[in-house]
C-alpha cells in the first residue's frame, strides 16, 4: 500500500493536489489525528484500497502531539507545498479567503504557519514551490514524482440505457443504431465479448458509424489529457448493455490503446431483463 501525507502552506495548492491524488486513486482524508492513521490503513487494506493519503495543515498540528512518533513508525511519503509570501498574499487577496490561523495580519500568519510546519517540511520527500506553477504544472510535478507520467487513463464503460447511463460519464456514445444481436436467437444468450456477436455488430454497413464514434472518443480524450486531467470516462450505451455496447467498448479499447492507457468496464453485461 502507498501511504502519502500531503501538507504545506495554505494557499500553496493543497486543494488542487488533493483532487489530483484522488484522480490517481488515492483515498484522501483531511486532518485525521496521527493515532488514527494505523487503524485507517488497516481498514483500507481490508477494503482493498491500494493508495491512501492524509492532508495535514497548520490548524491541526496543535492536536498532533504524536505526529513525530507515528511518522517514524509508518514512514509515509511526505509531500510539502509552499510558495513565496508575496504570492500567497496575492492569492489570498484574489480569493478573499481568511487564513486558517486567522489572527488578522496575513503576512504574520503566513510566517507563523511556515514556522509551525518546518518539522514536516524537513521530513518531506518532495517539496514543491508553486509560486510560478499553474494547477496543471503542479499536477505534472506530482505525477513525475509518483511515477505517474503516463497517468492519464481513458475509461470505457459499456452500459444499457434501460438501466441508466453511468453518472461518472464525461461523454456518452449511443450505439443503438448498430445491428442488434438480441434479435438473433443464436446470439441472444451471448455477449459482446463473443467473436460471432462482434462480427454481427460490425457489419460493413455499421463501419462508418463506428469510425465516427472512434474519432469522437479519441478527440475528446486528447482534449482531456491536454487539459491536465488524470482520467476521462467514455460511456458506451446500447439498449440492455450486453451486446453492442460491450463489442464497441472492446474495439475502442483495442484501437485507442496505442494512444492512451485504457481501462474497460462492462457494467451491465451480466444483467438480465
Curated annotation (Swiss-Prot):
Gene3D superfamilies found in the cross-reference section: P-loop containing nucleotide triphosphate hydrolases
Residues binding GTP: 57-60
GO molecular function, one term: ATP binding
Keyword GTP-binding: yes
Keywords for the protein's UniProt record, in alphabetical order: ATP-binding, GTP-binding, Nucleotide-binding
InterPro entries found in the cross-reference section: P-loop_NTPase, RapZ-like, RapZ-like_N, RapZ_C
Domain of life: Bacteria
Keyword Metal-binding applies: no
Pfam family, one: RapZ-like_N
Residues annotated for ATP binding in this entry: 8-15
Known role: Displays ATPase and GTPase activities.
Family to which the UniProt record says this protein belongs: Belongs to the RapZ-like family.
Protein name: Nucleotide-binding protein TT_C1664
Organism of origin: Thermus thermophilus (strain ATCC BAA-163 / DSM 7039 / HB27)
